[in-house]
């Protein structure tokens, strides 16, 4: 159990650190009442790049949520309550969240009523961690060296993100460069203490069996992607696209 909690917290540290800067491009599609509004929350970069390889059905109206600057000591629930202003809740909508974005999507579902939540390479509930690793979190939050060290692209980060191609390595390097240190530290503190116990009823979880950041043995996904790592939404986009099109269009 201790080894599992250590692995879980290591995963939380890494994937939270790369949760992205709060300066995204705006929504990329115009409103169309005949289409299903789907809001995408990236956990891995400063913009929608992580979703750039997806091929989605024309009847899906894609919107990208912009990260906001977190308030001091703000909880994930309160943060979700602020960014929900970007969602038109007067019309049916769905949420798709990757990694950290999946956690925020789960918190949004406690406030609004999405038709469905799809999380990818994420967790639907908090993962328990040991006191030792909680202490490690506090140390990293106080260390002036945490940001520069953990924002560097190297063999270790490539390995844990399963960035095996030149294209995926280039993307990961750019993502790390764009990550805002203050956002990074806030996200680390909040995800490390996330205590959500109940999975949302209308949640669908897609996870890779080779995810090194959030090992599959620590979560209970609905759909397992063979050979999928943490960046599978980008690297195995065709397979993920097929699943998303099927699931999202079911609720239309």
Segments and roles (model prediction):
Residues 9-20:
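Bacterial N-terminal signal peptides
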Residues 26-70:
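Conserved HGGG/HGGXW glycine-rich cap/lid loop of the alpha/beta-hydrolase fold
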Residues 52, 57-94:
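Active-site loop/oxyanion-hole signature of alpha/beta-hydrolase fold enzymes
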Residues 73-74, 228-243:
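Catalytic histidine-centered segment of alpha/beta-hydrolase-like enzymes
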Residues 96-105:
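Gly/Ala-rich beta-loop-alpha elbow adjacent to hydrolase catalytic centers
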Residues 113-146:
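Flexible "cap/lid" loop of the alpha/beta hydrolase fold
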Residues 148-195:
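Conserved alpha/beta-hydrolase catalytic His-Asp/Glu region
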Residues 205-207, 211:
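Short beta-strand/loop motif that positions the catalytic acidic residue
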């Amino acid at each position: 159990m201790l080894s599992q909690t250590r692995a879980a917290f290591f995963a939380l540290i890494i994937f939270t650190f790369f949760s992205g800067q709060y300066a995204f491009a705006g929504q990329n599609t115009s409103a169309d009442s005949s289409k299903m509004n789907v809001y995408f929350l990236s956990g891995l970069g400063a913009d929608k790049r992580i979703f750039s390889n997806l091929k989605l059905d024309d009847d899906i109206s894609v919107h990208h949520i912009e990260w906001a600057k977190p308030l001091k000591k703000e909880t994930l629930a309160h943060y979700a309550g602020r960014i929900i202003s970007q969602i038109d809740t007067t019309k049916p909508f769905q949420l798709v969240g990757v990694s950290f974005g999946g956690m925020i999507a789960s918190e949004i579902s406690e406030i609004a009523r999405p038709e469905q939540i799809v999380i990818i390479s994420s967790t639907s509930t908090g993962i328990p961690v040991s006191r030792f690793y909680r202490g490690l979190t506090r140390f990293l939050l106080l260390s002036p060296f945490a940001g520069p060290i953990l924002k560097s692209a190297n063999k270790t980060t490539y390995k844990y993100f399963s960035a095996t191609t030149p294209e995926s390595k280039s993307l990961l390097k750019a993502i790390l460069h764009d990550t805002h240190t203050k956002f990074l530290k806030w996200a680390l503190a909040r995800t490390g203490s996330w205590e959500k116990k109940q999975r949302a009823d209308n949640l669908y979880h897609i996870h890779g069996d080779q995810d090194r950041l959030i090992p599959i043995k620590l979560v209970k996904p609905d759909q397992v992607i063979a050979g999928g790592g943490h960046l599978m939404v980008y690297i195995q986009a065709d397979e993920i696209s097929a699943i998303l099109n099927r699931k999202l269009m079911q609720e239309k």
